[in-house]
A protein has these predicted regions:
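Surface-exposed, charge/polar-rich loops and edge strands
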Residues: 1-139, 149-398
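Extracellular attachment/recognition segments
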Residues: 142-143
Length: 398
């Protein structure tokens, strides 16, 4: 199976750059797997597509402002050409860091820019001044002369966060160890920026802190560096309407990490490997899911992150005596890669946004609905000018 099998034509103007004023005013393409029919709807119709007794499963992970701007200490300066913008940033010590996954009490995996010049042993200082300066002149577009650049001593004194590079991963990511602070996430909330995906061609704005977050994201479930975007369409009223229809709602957590930004570099789909992402399923959620499966009720997953969590959890358990899948409560790390040929054990229906060409998320949707069906649906969505990707419209497959 080739990655090119999952390519499709997408005009650039259909990539949503802004969130809609009303979350629930997005469009919804309804795809029936049995009839392969499409129906153009609005998301406000979604509750009517659910059945009494369905179990709707949400990912309640909370996005944090994971993009940090800082300065390096300059302890390991390397000779670089000032003609290159990234090299100029390096000479001035400017660094952009995208935290992707917490791997220890003070340790994080991160993407670093300019990446090739930041070696093990480097120290990076983060302050409010760094953040403001980066928005005025984004990293890798710095002026070749910045006479007001502070020196290393001043940076260290002003820093509210300090990290040392302690490792480098196989995909180019760095491992950072942060010096302890009283409340790490509170400091990141102050200094950080919303990690909008690269296809949103603008800087983040204050309103993105609300709109690039589901209304049901829980404060205690903070840890995602990208939103579980299928959930962005929900409002409290929509959730109330769903409950009134006799639909049960369960929540789990999967912290969206580096895999969201990871392109597929191989030609054969089967050779691709996903990064691990942390997840947790509570005792209450596990009971809800197992009861629905035992009673042969539909499990409706909101988003690909929910699908991966459910199917990974089920893959760790044997079938019940009745031959149904089960999940266990607990925490772990999921690296399940779902593409056509995968046998779904838990999910009966899927709400998902429109995904990038040749992406692992499109492969997951194709595994669930059939590649040809999904590509036909996407061609219809392009023709009808649906909005694509994170701030775009959605599709319900049943």
């Amino acid at each position: 199976m080739l990655v090119s099998d999952f390519d499709f034509y997408l005009p650039e103007e259909l990539i949503a750059q802004e969130a809609l004023a009303d979350r629930s005013s997005s469009r919804l393409l309804h795809l029936s797997r049995s009839t392969v029919n499409f129906e153009d709807r609005k998301f406000v119709d979604f509750p009517s597509l659910l059945r009494s007794g369905d179990l709707l499963v949400l990912n309640s992970s909370r996005v944090f402002p994971a993009r940090l701007y800082g300065h390096r200490a300059g302890l390991h300066a390397q000779p670089v050409s000032p003609r290159n913008p990234a090299a100029r940033d390096f000479l001035h010590g400017r660094v952009e860091v995208m935290l992707t996954r917490q791997i220890g009490p003070q340790e994080w995996q991160a993407l670093v820019r300019p990446g090739r010049k930041i070696g093990v042993g480097e120290k990076i200082f983060f302050s409010a001044a760094d953040s403001a300066r980066a928005l005025a002149a984004p990293v890798s577009a710095a002026s070749p002369s910045e006479p007001n650049d502070p020196g290393s001593a001043a940076l260290a004194q002003a820093a509210e966060l300090t990290a040392e590079v302690i490792g480098r991963g196989e995909f180019g990511e760095r491992t950072l160890r942060f010096e302890p602070v009283p409340n790490f996430f509170a400091t990141v909330e102050k200094l950080g920026h919303v990690p909008l995906p690269p296809y949103i061609a603008r800087e983040d704005r204050p309103e993105d802190r609300e709109r690039y977050q589901t209304v049901y994201a829980r404060a205690e479930a903070i840890g995602s560096v990208a939103a579980p975007t299928a959930g962005l369409h929900f409002t409290p009223q929509i959730l109330a309407d769903i409950r009134e229809r006799g639909v049960e709602i369960a929540e789990l957590t999967l912290h969206v990490g580096l895999g969201t930004f990871q392109p597929v570099h191989v030609e054969n789909v089967e050779e691709h490997k996903l990064h691990r992402e942390s997840f947790s399923i509570s005792d209450a959620a596990a009971r809800q899911i197992n009861r629905a499966l035992a009673e042969k009720r539909r499990v409706v997953a909101v988003g690909t992150t929910t699908v991966r969590t459910l199917e990974f959890a089920a893959s760790q358990n044997a079938l019940s005596s009745a031959g149904t899948a089960t999940v266990s409560a607990g925490a772990g790390e999921a690296d399940i890669f779902i593409y056509p040929g995968f046998k779904f054990r838990v999910v009966s229906a899927l709400l998902t946004n429109f995904h990038l060409p040749k992406s692992t998320l499109l492969m997951l949707a194709s595994a669930f609905a059939g590649r040809e069906n999904v590509l036909k649906a996407y061609a219809h969505a392009v023709e009808e000018k649906y909005r694509f990707f994170s701030y775009g419209d959605c599709m319900f497959v049943e």
